[in-house]
Amino acid sequence: PAVLIPRPETELLLEAALAFTQPRDHAVVVDVGTGSGALAVTLAALCPRAVVYAVDASHPALEVARRNAAAHQADVVFFEGDLLLPIQERQMQVDMIMANLPYI
């Protein structure tokens, strides 16, 4: 499969990300290893003032994430690359980095 099914602890990570992001105006968040985009898409949909970036090394995974973002009208900017490299290459400043990487 192009992506893995999000694990139950994904919801806990999302709750923590929301608690950090919601009180801030225009928080900049990066989802590393976005996979299906579950975290990035949900965060962008629930916090429309946030700037959400999603990074994955897998082109097929990013295609799934892009479709999910479009389906939920979530404003997410996607980068293909290894971990934080696309963010570092662009010298981007971020407020929060989140990752729910596979461990299998």
Give the location of each predicted region.
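Acidic di-acidic motifs
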Residues: 1-2, 57
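Conserved SAM-binding loop and adjacent beta-strand
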Residues: 2-15
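Conserved SAM/SAH cofactor-binding pocket of Class I
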Residues: 12-104
